A protein has these predicted regions:
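Aromatic-rich carbohydrate-recognition surfaces in CAZymes
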Residues: 138-139, 160-163, 172, 234-236, ...
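Catalytic cores of carbohydrate-active enzymes
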Residues: 273, 391, 395-401, 442-550, ...
Length: 645
């Protein structure tokens, strides 16, 4: 029984199948993403979506889709599927689907009368290319396949419409054509492994709609250009490979290339292997620089997300070298930042006040996975430089006060992970003494003190420990209230009494200013008011402004983004905190909490975890289809569990 298999009943029910998406990527940031019935429902969907750096830093849809037609005895059966105005779908190729399986690679089986055709897709790892293999499993008469490519050549942030500027010219290449619709774009090569006929019949397919964009309150229709179609005969038992990429291939090698790519894949045959595959999709390499993308399909590399996700996406998979590759790029960006120079790398939001503290936390995980000695040898100077930068009050928005706490101004600009903004103003103006900033600060002080003490720098270690004593005492005085939980932020007389998840870090981190009884009180209230099967709520239902449903147009979603929605990445820190308090006796509870994520592997983005969930039942997945911090933290919990067995 395949772990990721969907039967005819589900596939032909568009209310179900259109809610499930697949994502395949390469190391360069290109991807293929669509629904499991190959009907694009987002402007971000496409068969071949690639970065075009000489235009901008966005991804661009070159090949939106490829419609296949089976031709037998003069009858045509179109396997494509698009949505048009008025909830009209055409040409309804999904009705021929018998099965979809993506345990190894995405494979769709169609049955049209006596014809059984299997379609398998693979996104090439090291170049911008998608390969599609068609195998005729059964047929009782001569069969021809027709392929009609739908071209977009536009940014994922925009739409294309019929226009006179589009270049209709094409050139023949071996077993195919190359074409480019607009200046600045690369040529798109479409080739088959077998001699075929290309029929030039240029046309625009108008009014194709993307219902997910409509749900999100955006424009949702466009026109796609079809230059013509390819036709090729296929015999029973024969396989034909279609290639779309930005460079020409040797057609006779396509079958071999396809097989080699298949052998290079780890099957998604379990919860762990799904997450492992998903983790690798966030790695982005541009020449010698390594990044972690925050999510698909629209996020770039964001500094905070990168440092939070990095341990789970690498160390939890025993991929220490991958951690070091990313940190090599990150260290250069950090040093540029603390030297008040342009960051110079494609890491966004480095200026956010907690980013350096999360970098320290990531390096702390590295020390635990390798050794303190190795961490000190490799990153000791960086850690000391970060600490000096903060202690010398050089950060433009992170101020060390005499009471030992860090203060940041978030009144006019969102500066924490709760970063939603409406009309230029933060929805949640977390400002002043922010609870997780100071939990991170205390943890960093103690960690670096211990690290440098072991390296012989007793003077600095004593300084940092003395600082931590002051910080810890003030932390308890400022944040802990009479109900046993922690204020979310404090700015003078303004105190946020909302029950939010940011206090859980004080229980999860290795070093905490709270004693065990205080930690348990924090854990208990998070368990009681914020825990859901899909993540930790961003706000308690008992607090004012609770809004658990992340739906509607952008402004409505922005107001709900951190007002009760559930976030899986927070579950990682929550479960780590739970194990700190309950140790072996908490194992069964932690394992039960992970079951709902196993269920998630066949929903939303198949084999991955979306950005967030509604905070109330049925806890529907929302936002980006695959989110790095979520995948990372669940992997990190699995790694923590493995150490108990």
């Amino acid at each position: 029984m395949s772990y990721l298999r969907f039967d005819k009943t589900l596939m032909t029910n568009l209310e179900e199948s259109l809610q499930r998406e697949i994502l395949r990527t390469n190391k360069a940031g290109a991807y293929h993403c669509t629904t499991i019935v190959d009907c694009n429902t987002r402007k971000y969907h496409g068969l071949l979506v690639i970065p075009v750096p000489n235009i901008d830093d966005e991804n661009h849809v070159l090949l939106s889709s490829l419609d296949e037609t089976i031709i037998q005895l003069g009858a045509e059966f179109n396997l494509g599927l698009h949505k048009y105005q008025g909830n009209n779908f055409s040409p309804n190729g999904h009705k021929y689907i018998r099965e979809f399986d993506c345990e190894h690679i995405p494979a769709t089986t169609y049955r049209v009368g006596g014809v059984i055709l299997r379609k398998e897709k693979i996104f090439v790892h090291h170049e911008n290319r998608i390969l599609i293999r068609y195998t005729l499993l059964d047929a009782h008469s001569a069969t021809t396949l027709r392929f009609r490519p739908f071209l977009a050549f536009r940014s994922v942030r925009e739409y294309t419409h019929e226009n006179a500027q589009a270049n209709r010219e094409y050139q023949l290449v071996e077993n195919g054509i190359k074409t480019c619709m607009y200046p600045g774009y690369p040529e798109l090569y479409m080739q088959l492994n077998k001699k075929c006929e290309f029929h030039f019949m240029p046309d625009w397919y108008r009014g194709i709609e993307y219902p997910k964009e409509q749900e999100r309150g955006y424009d949702f229709n466009e026109d796609l250009y079809v230059p013509g179609y390819f036709e090729v005969d296929i015999k029973k038992g024969e396989s034909i490979v279609f290639s779309a990429g930005t460079s020409e291939v040797t057609p006779r090698r396509l079958k071999q290339t396809f097989e080699a790519e298949v052998l290079d894949r780890t099957p998604r045959d379990s919860f762990y292997h799904c997450l492992k595959n998903s983790a690798h999709q966030f790695h982005n390499q541009q020449e010698d620089e390594h990044y972690i993308l925050a999510g698909y399909p629209w996020f770039k590399c964001r500094a905070r997300d990168m440092f939070i996700a990095l341990p789970g996406l690498t160390l939890a998979l025993d991929e220490v070298d991958q951690f070091e590759d990313v940190m090599k790029t990150a260290e250069k960006a950090i040093r540029n930042f603390i030297n008040e120079e342009p960051v110079g790398y494609k890491i966004y939001e480095m200026e956010h006040p907690d980013v350096l503290l999360w970098a320290v936390w990531a390096l702390q995980q590295y020390a635990k996975e390798t050794s303190r000695e190795q961490c000190r040898q490799k990153y000791g100077e960086l850690l000391k430089d970060i600490m000096e930068f903060i202690r010398q009050r050089k950060h433009e928005n992170l101020f060390l006060h005499d009471n030992g706490l860090l203060f940041a101004n978030g009144t006019d600009k969102a500066i924490t992970w709760m970063n939603s903004t409406v009309n230029g103003h933060p929805v949640i103006p977390r400002t002043g003494y922010i609870v997780e900033f100071n939990a991170l600060w205390y943890n960093a002080l103690r960690f670096i003190a211990d690290l440098v003490r072991e390296g012989g720098d007793v003077y600095l270690a004593d300084e940092l420990d003395a600082q931590a004593e002051v910080t810890g005492k003030s932390f308890v005085e400022v944040f802990r209230n009479e109900y046993g939980y922690l204020l979310d932020y404090v700015d003078g007389n303004m105190m946020d009494w909302s029950v939010r998840p940011n206090m859980i870090f004080t229980v999860a981190f290795d070093y905490s200013p709270l004693d065990r009884a205080q930690k348990k009180q924090v854990l208990d209230i998070v368990t009681k008011e914020l825990l859901t099967p899909k993540g930790i709520r961003s706000l308690s239902p008992k607090s004012g402004g609770y809004n658990p449903n992340y739906v509607g147009p952008q402004i409505q979603r922005d107001y709900a983004y951190h007002q009760g929605t559930a976030w899986p990445w927070l579950m990682g820190f929550y479960l780590e905190a739970y194990l700190r308090i309950y140790k072996m006796s908490g194992l069964s509870f932690v394992e039960r909490q992970l079951i709902s994520y196993d269920d998630e592997m066949t929903s939303h983005c198949v084999g991955s975890i979306p950005e967030l969930f509604d905070g109330n039942p049925p806890f529907k997945g929302r936002g980006a289809v695959s989110f790095a911090m979520n995948v990372a933290e669940i992997l990190r919990v699995l790694k923590l569990l493995s150490k108990y067995y």
